[in-house]
């Protein structure tokens, strides 16, 4: 919030205003000049809060402190709204190990940059009726990523693809490591195959 967006001190000129303090004080309905006098005596500012109210509402406060706190809230809100970047990497069921190594190398770089990585295995022909071959590839990838990233939920089938999202591991204090491992057991081949039916039905 800038000074151009609010009326302060001598710029406020109303016959009557409802004047309140920043800590809940109620000064009542007085002239804007009287309200300004109160603010000046306290070494504070008079800020117009609501011009449309009848009478208009003014608050006695430290405007610079108010502006700083407001700008801080806006910055924090923008950080929370920051979109997560997702990088997509396509694989095939017949991919060679050296090609997997190359693609995983890039995936790890993305994860280290705090990006999410979505691996998609292309299912060709009859493979689309049985995603086992695709899951086998994803399992190989998972073992190469497990020290740096966590799989998000289970793999899921999307038409001619079977995909799996990986996200950066949260940085936690050492005392929480044991609890984290207990709450997030590693995926294994059995779990993957059990989840295959769920993956086919999940959208």
Curated annotation (Swiss-Prot):
Q: Where does the record say this protein resides?
A: Cytoplasm
Q: Which InterPro entries does this chain map to?
A: T_IF-3_C_sf (IPR036788), T_IF-3_N_sf (IPR036787), Translation_initiation_fac3_CS (IPR019813), Translation_initiation_fac_3 (IPR001288), Translation_initiation_fac_3_C (IPR019815), Translation_initiation_fac_3_N (IPR019814)
Q: Any idea which UniProt keywords this protein has?
A: Cytoplasm, Initiation factor, Protein biosynthesis
Residue segments, region Disordered:
172-203
GO cellular component terms, alphabetically, are:
cytosol
Task: Provide the disulphide bond pattern.
Answer: none
Q: By its UniProt entry, which SUPFAM superfamilies does this protein fall under?
A: Translation initiation factor IF3, C-terminal domain (SSF55200), Translation initiation factor IF3, N-terminal domain (SSF54364)
Coiled coil (residue ranges): none
Q: Name one GO biological process term.
A: ribosome disassembly
The answer on whether this UniProt entry bears the keyword RNA-binding reads no
Gene3D superfamilies referenced in this protein's UniProt entry, alphabetically: Translation initiation factor 3 (IF-3), C-terminal domain, Translation initiation factor 3 (IF-3), N-terminal domain
Q: Does the keyword Cytoplasm apply?
A: yes
* Chief location: cytoplasm
Positions with biased composition (Basic and acidic residues): 172-182
- Tell me the domain of life: Bacteria
Cite the GO molecular-function annotations of the record. ribosome binding; translation initiation factor activity
PANTHER family recorded for this chain? TRANSLATION INITIATION FACTOR IF-3, TRANSLATION INITIATION FACTOR IF-3, MITOCHONDRIAL
Q: What does this protein do?
A: IF-3 binds to the 30S ribosomal subunit and shifts the equilibrium between 70S ribosomes and their 50S and 30S subunits in favor of the free subunits, thus enhancing the availability of 30S subunits on which protein synthesis initiation begins.
Q: Which HAMAP family match?
A: IF_3
Task: Summarize subunit and interaction data from the UniProt record for this chain.
Answer: Monomer.
Q: Which family does it belong to?
A: Belongs to the IF-3 family.
What protein is this chain from? Translation initiation factor IF-3
Q: Which gene encodes it?
A: infC
């Amino acid at each position: 919030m800038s000074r151009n967006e609010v009326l302060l001190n001598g710029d406020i000129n109303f016959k009557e205003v409802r004047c309140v303090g920043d800590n809940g004080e109620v000064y009542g309905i007085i002239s804007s000049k009287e309200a300004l006098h109160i603010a000046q005596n306290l070494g504070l500012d008079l800020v117009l809060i609501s011009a449309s109210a009848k009478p208009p509402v003014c608050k006695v406060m430290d405007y610079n402190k108010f502006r700083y706190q407001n700008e801080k809230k806006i910055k924090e809100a923008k950080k929370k709204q920051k979109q997560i970047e997702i990088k997509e990497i396509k694989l095939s069921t017949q991919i060679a190990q050296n090609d997997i190594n190359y693609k995983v190398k890039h995936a790890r770089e993305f994860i280290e940059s705090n990006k999410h990585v979505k691996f998609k295995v292309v299912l060709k022909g009859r493979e689309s009726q049985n995603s086992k071959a695709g899951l086998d590839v994803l399992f190989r990838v998972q073992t190469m990523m497990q020290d740096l990233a966590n799989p998000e939920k289970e793999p899921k089938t999307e038409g001619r693809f079977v995909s799996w999202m990986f996200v950066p591991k949260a940085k936690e204090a050492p005392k929480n490591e044991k609890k984290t491992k207990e709450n997030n057991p590693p995926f294994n081949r059995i779990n993957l195959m059990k989840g295959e039916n769920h993956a086919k039905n999940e959208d």
